[in-house]
Amino acid sequence: MNGSVVITGGGTGGHLKVADAFIEELYNRGIGIIFIGSLNGHDKAWFQNDKRLKKAIFLDTKGVVNKKGLGKFLSLFNILSKALYCLNLYSKYNIKTVISVGGFSAAPATFASILKFGSNLYIHEQNSRMGKLNQLTAKFATEVFSSFDENSLVKDYPVSSEFFNYARVRDKVKTVAFFGGSQGAICINDFALKVAPKLQKMGINIIHQTGKNDFMRVKTKYEELGIKVDVFDFSKQIPLKMSTADFAVSRAGASTLWELCANSLPTFFIPYKYAASDHQYYNAKVLKDKGLCFLKREDELDEEYFFEAINSDIHKISIELISSINPNAISLIVNIILQNNKK
């Protein structure tokens, strides 16, 4: 195809994982890629020195949601000025295709795509509840892809092949993994410490990702309890850690949820209660309604329910998780985008 493709969006890991999947697929097909993200968030840490990119641009953009009065006006004005910058960039690099993965980072480049005649905008919505930016711009998109939308041309979620490669069917719970994410989740950490003594008595091993801020407290507490645990704050070996586990306790961000599915790992989800539009709860509810996971809100956490879950038929759930997601999602999405560009 002529020209380069713009990938835009980020701010948080969930958006950035999907951006990375698109970059990898397009790069492997020999297509030039420009990434447009924000200085505020994790975008720069992910892509500043990425050799797969023709260019990486980080704009001083901030979210508009939850702002009021003058703050909201200034944020909107900032987005408009950055959108005009993106328009000039599109002309310079002959940009006709923009892929947005959402998040406040995506706003300027997405609006610029809408304003540019002949530009095709594609949106990937990660969550069961559409983000504010995507709600506003979806009507202008050539196509919107979502794992939670029955009308989406591709319903599978872009997940790294590692999670599929390490997948296995579980029969019995010998190891439980607690995943609070790289930022950690005190709620999950405290719950793990509460159930750890009984897990030890049952002969069940524990893997625990605490997040950086809570690592020393949790590690010290396990030592005081005399329980040997594979406890860590952050790891690049999460697919391998998942593979070692037979059951998981986790937040329900979209990327994490589908990674666990790809690994065929039965999971007890505890959604982050302050997630926008309560999307983590509704992400997990899609699986819960199919009998493919266990789900409790933070305020309803119940040790008895947890132990009932690990003693349930995890073999059946693990087998059914295999067919809940296919490994070629990003390839199928890019095929559709490239095919549309030929029209």
Each language-model region and where it sits:
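Conserved nucleotide-sugar phosphate-binding/catalytic loop shared by glycosyltransferases and other
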Residues: 2-10, 27-78, 214, 296-299
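Glycosyltransferases and closely related glycan-assembly transferases
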Residues: 49-54, 84-99, 107-122, 135, ...
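Active-site-proximal region of nucleotide-activated glycan assembly enzymes
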Residues: 4, 31-32, 53-54, 114-166
